[in-house]
Regions:
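Short beta-strand His + acidic residue motifs that chelate non-heme Fe in jelly-roll/DSBH
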Residues: 79-82, 100-101, 132, 137-143, ...
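A short hydrophobic beta-strand segment most commonly corresponding to one strand
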Residues: 90, 145-160
């Protein structure tokens, strides 16, 4: 039987309430999200070519405050570097591709202007996932329309988090 959204929600709840460190739970949540994204019935029920651009909540666990969000991006679209503050996120692509970049801040956080350099680039193709712990800087790029599931540890729009501001911050390329 195919892995379902309900099973995924039960699994992430169990992982997050098991007492194990978040650093151990997040990769396992990412594995379970991959299982869900490899269920063609889930993908077909959640996304179609007519699904409007934007974000919608598929599930919210009030005990852990985890959100399972479905995103449709109308590419090409390139996001700026950001993190999820004290929370975390797991990204997974259902259809198309999400190009990810991970960043490192090269100057102290006490300085107002952030100086970032890229440390990793990779593609999340259908079924692939990646977990980003608290404070991990990353950015997304969608070369075309993309259908993505994002799981967050809370409502990340309601907490302080870093967002790259091009008028203030800068990016340096590695030599």
């Amino acid at each position: 039987m195919a892995y379902t959204l309900e099973q995924f929600c039960e699994d992430h709840h169990a992982l997050l309430t098991s007492g194990q460190p978040l650093s151990k739970a997040l990769p396992r949540i990412a594995e379970r999200l991959s299982d869900l994204l490899n269920n063609p019935e889930f993908v077909a029920e959640t996304f179609s070519d007519d699904t409007p651009v934007g974000r919608r909540t598929l599930a919210h666990d009030p005990d852990t405050d985890v959100y399972v969000l479905a995103h449709v991006y109308d590419g090409p679209k390139k996001g700026s570097p950001h993190n999820h503050g004290a929370s975390w996120a797991v990204y997974g692509t259902a259809k198309a591709v999400t190009n990810m970049t991970e960043w490192r801040r090269t100057n102290p956080e006490t300085e107002e202007q952030a100086v970032l350099e890229p440390v990793a680039h990779y593609a999340l193709t259908p079924g692939l996932t990646r977990a980003y712990g608290p404070g991990v800087l990353h950015s997304t790029e969608h070369p075309g329309k993309a259908w993505v599931i994002r799981v967050t540890g809370t409502d990340v729009d309601a907490i302080p988090r870093f967002r790259f501001k091009p008028e203030r911050d800068r990016i340096v390329e590695k030599v």
